[in-house]
Amino acid sequence: MKVPMSWLQAMVNLPDGTTTDKVAKALTNHTATVEKVEVVGGELTGPIVIGHILSSVPEPQKNGKVINWCRVDVGPRYNAEGHPKNIEEGVEGRGIICGAPNAVEGAWVVVSLPGAVLPGGFAISARKTYGHMSDGMLCASDELGIGVDDAGIITLPPSVEGHQLVPGEDALPILGVPEEVLDVDVTPDIGYCMSMRGIAREVAHAMSVHFRDPYDEEPIGPVLGPVAVDVQSDACSQFIALPVSGMNLGAPTPRFITDRITRAGMRPINLVVDVTNYVMLESGQPLHAYDADNVSGTIVVRKAHEGEHLLTLDDTDRTLDPDDLVIADDSGAIGLAGVMGGAATEVTAETTSIILEGAHFDPMTVARAYRRHKLGSEASRRFERGVDPICAHTAAVRAAELLAQYGGATVGEPTVVGEVPEMPRQTINADLPNRILGTKVPTEEVIEILTRSGVKVTALGDSLHLVAPTWRPDLVDAYDYVEEIGRKIGFDRIKAVLPPSLGASGLTKAQRGRRRVLRSVVEAGFVELITLPFIGDKDLDVLGISGDDTRHATVKLANPLDDTRPYLRTTLLPGLFHAVTTNMSRSQDDLAVFESGTVFRAVTPAAAPRPGVDERPSDEVLAEIDAALPAQPRMLAAVICGSWLPDRWDGESVKADWRHAVLVAQKAADALGVRLVRKADRQAPWHPGRCAALIVDGKVIGHAGELHPTVVSKAGLPQRTCAVEFNLDALVAAAPRGGEVMAISSFPVAKEDVALVVDKSVAAEDVRQALIEGAGPLLESIELFDVYEGEQVGDNRKSLAFNLRLRGADRTLTDSEALETRDAAVARAEETCGAQLRS
């Protein structure tokens, strides 16, 4: 928001000698940051004076252009004979060439004389052009860097604000330059500062001076006027239609209006547009003007019909959404409420009668509409932040009065439909601001601050009953008022106090567990990666997973970074596959990489409710939202390819295989003290004969093994690439909370080896578990050290060889005790697994 200081001073009684820097500092400390201070006309130097055109002779040129040879009175000082004039001896004035069509006899103009320097370092000097010595320049607004003037050069009335112009006097004070303009960064929560009225109120409060409110009126209720209006939507609380007729649209806009809106960052167009923009900048209330002759029947405020179209002022045919709020007449939609008007009722050069619209629209409705149509405007920026509802009527009346004053219009009676909505009420403890801000502000000062902010305050004991002013929709709950008090006393007055130490709680059990797991995987030789959490249909097709797999339950992004990957990942493997292929393209062929991260699986079809923003959602609504969220388990995955150990002088290379994939899961389980069971399984994308299910506490938490050749080919991975993926949250949750530390026995160990023959379908883990049960408490450890399949054990049979370590806690085991324990273990394996002792 750009704030010209002269406009600000029209509303605020700033003390004499108040500098712009002081105003900027006060505004920054209490309300919004002043990003910079611009100086309009600050580059102008030299003689720039008021001139009076005594004569103007049009002279057509060969190129078809018409120039004016003007004799300009610039006062006794600059008309003197000592200055070059290029006109007859004894004749007053200077000769100046000008091509502007409004350089006519009798006009009062701004003249840059030789020696003046304009913006960009453009120096003025006498020079011969079009057959004459041009002794200066008649200036346009853009040439002075103070605005835009499509009519040509600047022309002034003979009297400006009661001052009779005199040829030769300094023109810059007449033009109001140089003028300082504040560039204020208005954040979304202080939408009322999108107006001069709002900024002026904040400056007055910050500097403890008087504020003159040009829109200080009481709310107006329904009024039956000549324009028929029907409001059919709750998204419009009040609508004002004010007819203005007999208007001369060709009348020039007063210079004070064009100067102010130009310095505020807007371009002058014509009287109606300039006046509505001026009032919007002044009050914060957007207005819209309809050509009354093109409005048929009743003006209706309603939601758009399905498939309805509107040709907007930017000449774009828009298909409306049923949630769009529109202004319509008997012919259909004539405007997108709060955003942009329609071309059918646009004010043109032939317009003589208009209907001024002032309305209060729902901020969310306007915000959604302009985002839906990608049609931001000055009006929508203000409506979405909240507009003072009282100004809907007062701003329309103000604009109509200006049109009557400067355009000769006649103002009719307004039609007012709806009421100004009531503002929220709140009760707070008088000491709440001090408790939250850490200040010691007396209650009397709190009341004074809120009252100056426009809040109606009623003190009852230790409580303050508060009613927000109409221009402050941001004051809703108690803490909004606390923030208001903090801003108004100045955050620079609040001393920095370190919060008391609550004692370090440390990491949670889950955090400690995850760190141990990640550290163990890194120590095993793997490199951690972080990949983007997005996948596409092609990624899922590469994995070869079935349609009912939970990894197909994707969450689609509304605005994906990459249209080919519009889903949140349901597995970590695609990201690792992309990372591996990228590294291979850079000649990195031996890779062992892993990633831990969240995946997202929409396993519940429920849709999350959309609560309003005006109140806290209930516990039931929050529970429904949580229930509709996708499952988000934290997973760990790794991919291994190439050589596990490269060729070296003391041995051959070791190729990576499925055992290294299983190693990742085993290392993770060992780091947590969790018993991991591995069992043959079939699961995409792994090879059906080289895939192990990873089981903890009887539940499958993941899989490991060699990838299916088809998957390897589609993903562009090296042959025999292996992978593992498991639920890290489930593994960490299974970690024991504590354990018993067994005493270290000083007695020798007894070692027994057994080789058992079982069917190929029997899992080695089942045999191992049977041996543990049969051996009893003397078994210290057991290890599978050999697997054999061949003629010696028969078809569909395999031999599993285990090493049993036996030790007594209080004695040395005898040979017979060791043999008995071994036999008991074998007997249990025979009983449960059908195992036979291999001879």
Curated annotation (Swiss-Prot):
Its EC number is 6.1.1.20. GO terms for cellular component: phenylalanine-tRNA ligase complex. Residues 745-838 form the FDX-ACB domain. Binds 2 magnesium ions per tetramer. It is found in: Cytoplasm. Residues 421-496 form the B5 domain. Pfam families: B3_4, B5, FDX-ACB, tRNA_synthFbeta. NCBIfam families: pheT_bact. This is Phenylalanine--tRNA ligase beta subunit.
